Structure formats: structure tokens, C-alpha cells
């Protein structure tokens, strides 16, 4: 009767802490770094602060503009150059693909398609990226063929044109004429350098288009199902109330 009783909620000597010390706010799950995220809160993968598919679209746009500019510079050297030898058309197609990708990724992109419009835009971007890959491969092939010919040409200036021939023992060998050229060095030097630049740019651009196709395929057939599985696991591993 004379001994003082310990206050309620105070830890006894040698025993576990009393459960009464925890207030009602402590029973709620705390949100921190270890707290499970909700199903709709999947963080997008980033690269240098930018989402990875968005970075691919930006690369497509930059490379497409570069290919287009170099192609028009090549066309200005001679008026007799074929369209296949000045692949500005490949850059224009890749720029259109990039514009569609930027619109899709910045406005209405979702990893799991929730509407028919999102699915249609992703499918169209996938098909156009495949088309961009095809035209880039063609541009590389045409540029490489013309570059290999320029390395074997013997050129001479005639009036306002440059006439080039392949070394051959036949007297009637084929002659390539580059009109509106005052100096053959613009063909054997400048144009040859532009062909090499086009091969490099179109090769990189084709790889970026291939990677864009892979990312679209992966988001369609892999990330969607993995996201559903993670959501089910996080829902089952939620905090359980102790009895």
C-alpha cells in the first residue's frame, strides 16, 4: 500500500517496453525510403535526368537534322548527283519519327496502354522507327558504294564539269560527269568527306532507331507484366497490424 506505483506506459525493469506508450499516430505506416509504393507510382527510368525513351527521340531528332543538313550540302556541290547519293530523305524521315516520338513521350506516354489511342501511337512509332532503320541502312549502303568508287576515280576538269573514270584497260570505260563543278577537288575531297560523314551519321541513326524499336517492344511485352507482379507483391507485403 505504501509503495508508489509506476506510471502507466513506463518501461519496467528488465521487461519489454509497454505498448501503451505508443500514441495513435505511431500505429499508422510511416512513409519513407523503405515504404512500399503504390501500384501506379512506378518511377520511369531516367538517363541524365531524362526519361530513356524521350532521350532516344531527342537523339533521333538531332541525328535526323544532321543527316538532312549534310545531304543538302552534298546536293549543292553538283547538279548531276543522284538522289540516292545525297540522303537528305533519310534525315527527313527520321525527323518525322522523332517528332511523333516526342509528342507521344511528352504528352500521353504510358508503359501500360490504357486507351486505344496510346496503343495506336506506340505501334505507329514502332513501325516508323523500323522504317527509319531501313532507310538509314540504305543510305549507308549507297554512300559506301559511291565512296568506294571515288577512291578509284581518275578525275580531270573540263569546262564547267568534272569527268571521272575508273582505271580500266578498256578504252570505252564508263565516264562519270559531275556538272557545275569548277574544280575536281570539290568532288574528290569535299564530297568524299561528306560521304564518310553520312555513313557515320546514318549508322548511328540506324542504331538509335533499332534501340527505339527494342524499347517499345520491351515496354509492351515485358515491363507491363513485371509491373503487375510487383504491384501484387507490394500489396501482400504491406504493414500488418499486431494483435
From Swiss-Prot:
Encoding gene per record: SSPN
InterPro entries from the UniProt entry: CD20-like, Sarcospan
Record-linked Pfam families: CD20 (PF04103)
Cleavable signal peptide: none
Keyword vocabulary terms for this entry: Cell membrane, Membrane, Postsynaptic cell membrane, Synapse, Transmembrane, Transmembrane helix
UniProt-recorded name of the protein: Sarcospan
Residue span of region Disordered: 1-43
Cytoplasmic side, ranges: 1-53, 108-122, 215-243
Lineage top rank: taxon: Eukaryota
GO biological process terms held by the UniProt record: cell adhesion; muscle contraction
Main localization category: membrane
Amino acid at each position: 500500500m505504501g509503495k508508489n506505483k509506476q506510471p502507466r506506459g513506463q518501461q519496467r525493469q528488465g521487461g519489454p517496453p509497454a505498448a501503451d506508450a505508443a500514441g495513435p499516430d505511431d500505429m499508422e505506416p510511416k512513409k519513407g525510403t523503405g515504404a512500399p509504393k503504390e501500384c501506379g507510382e512506378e518511377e520511369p527510368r531516367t538517363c541524365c535526368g531524362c526519361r530513356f525513351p524521350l532521350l532516344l527521340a531527342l537523339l533521333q531528332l538531332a541525328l535526323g537534322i544532321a543527316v538532312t543538313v549534310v545531304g543538302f550540302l552534298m546536293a549543292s556541290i553538283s547538279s548531276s548527283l543522284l538522289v540516292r547519293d545525297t540522303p537528305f530523305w533519310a534525315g527527313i524521315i527520321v525527323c518525322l519519327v522523332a517528332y511523333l516520338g516526342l509528342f507521344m513521350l511528352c504528352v500521353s506516354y504510358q508503359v501500360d496502354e490504357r486507351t486505344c489511342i496510346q496503343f495506336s501511337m506506340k505501334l505507329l512509332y514502332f513501325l516508323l522507327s523500323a522504317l527509319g532503320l531501313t532507310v538509314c541502312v540504305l543510305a549507308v549502303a549507297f554512300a559506301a558504294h559511291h565512296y568506294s568508287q571515288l577512291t578509284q576515280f581518275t578525275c580531270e576538269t573540263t569546262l564547267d564539269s568534272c569527268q571521272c573514270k575508273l582505271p580500266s584497260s578498256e578504252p570505252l570505260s564508263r565516264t562519270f560527269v559531275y556538272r557545275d563543278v569548277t574544280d575536281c577537288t570539290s568532288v574528290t575531297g569535299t564530297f568524299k568527306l561528306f560521304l564518310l560523314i553520312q555513313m557515320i551519321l546514318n549508322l548511328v541513326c540506324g542504331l538509335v532507331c533499332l534501340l527505339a524499336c527494342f524499347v517499345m517492344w520491351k515496354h509492351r511485352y515485358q515491363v507491363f507484366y513485371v509491373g503487375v507482379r510487383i504491384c501484387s507483391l507490394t500489396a501482400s507485403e504491406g504493414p500488418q497490424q499486431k494483435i
